[in-house]
Amino acid sequence: MLNFKEKILITLPSLLISLIPLFLITGPFLSDLSVVLVCIFFLINIFLNKEYSFFNNKFFLIFLIFFLYLFINSLIKFYDFNNLRSSIGYLRFGIFSIAVIYFIEKQQKLLKWTFFVFVISFLLLVIDGYIQYFIKENIFGNPVDIRSLRIRLLFNDQYILGSYLSRLFPVFLALTFLLYGNKKNYIIFISFLFVLIETLIFLSGERVAFFFNTLSAIFIIILINKFKKIRFITLLLSFFTIFLISIYDDTAKKRIWDQTINQIGLDSSKMNIFSEIHESHYLSAYKMFLDNKVIGIGIRNFRNYCHEERYKTHADSCTTHPHNTYVQLLAETGLIGFLFGVTLFLYFIFKMLNHLKGALFKKQYLFNDFQICLLSAIFITIWPLAPSGNFFNNWISIVYFFPVGFFLWSLKN
């Protein structure tokens, strides 16, 4: 039985970690507050119990080097307090990842709590998402704007439902296989939820989210061992459901396929990278890089420099960030920061090829199915050939780092 002190220092932060998938639906405030509180509770526990060995972690060491570079970069390229604050605050994501390891070890129920929070969160979003798509209002009866051909996230005004589902679905999949992999009837039942989620990602009208979900599904099907057939069948059922819905209503099809073909320029003589506007962001970022090759213009500074005439490439080329992680790192952190990202991606590919080689020729798997699902979430985060959100945005950073802690825990155990 945990005493009152342990309930506060262990159970409370464990609950906060498990509630993050639900908090992310509401926006950045509650999820970011939870991350900060988890970090504080973690540090209190570490210093009270003198468990400093948790910092003796290769991931944290590499993260710390990257963080120190960001901090020094923001001092050298100081524009206003915003970029300095962002670099200092970035440390919390590395600490949070280590904290997840700590609290899972101290409170094993954290895994089940997180799973059930995922079930509740996804059920809420599935119900609301399909109501928005077919009835044109949310679950509260408020009308939605159907002209955008996209679906909003519940409790949120942003069109990021597909992004949320596609990035966190692999984590939900991982926990399902870990906790209930031996319960065949349960896996079959939960597979229907998988199909509903994947279909909704398509209906959300978010092209990148649909691409990422398909990419992670292929990644998982190729690399997992025990649940390969289940994942393949659910993907086929999802595509079949999407096909049937598209016959009835081609709203999502227009957004996913027709608009993409038009923006890339496949129906004209001029080809674009993703779209004409995306291409203008990349060209502006590249010009900034050419003027600041080694350390870039400073984190979160794209928005401050893009309005300058020398960097304008299009009427809409100025925005908050260049909409691609690697392009943003190149422009804002220079070659040094960019090499961090590229090295991580190449190392990741190397490990996955080793896993595939062992699976094909030796029937030995470097990673288990739980880890592969988590790695698929990380894979779509570091995938270079797709538009992405602001790398230093709080909400997206939480989504990026959330699976990392669970993966690190699995390596340790």
Where is each model-derived feature located?
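Transmembrane signal-anchor hairpin modules in multi-pass inner-membrane enzymes, especially those
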Residues: M1-N82, Y102-K112, F116, L175-I188, ...
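Alpha-helical transmembrane segments of multi-pass inner-membrane proteins
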Residues: I20, F71, I95, K112-N142, ...
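Long extracytoplasmic/lumenal interhelical loops at the membrane interface
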Residues: S268-D291, I295-T333
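Interfacial transmembrane-helix termini
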Residues: P21-V38, S53-N56, Y69-F93, I104-W113, ...
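A membrane-periplasm/extracellular boundary helix in multi-pass inner-membrane enzymes
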Residues: I127, S204, I224-S269, L283-D291, ...
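Juxtamembrane membrane-water interface segments that cap and precede transmembrane helices
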Residues: I17, N142-L154, A315-V327
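Transmembrane alpha-helices of multi-pass inner-membrane enzymes
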Residues: L37-L43, A217-I218, L344, L374-N413
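Selective detector of the "anchor" transmembrane alpha-helix that sits immediately C-terminal
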Residues: E332-N354
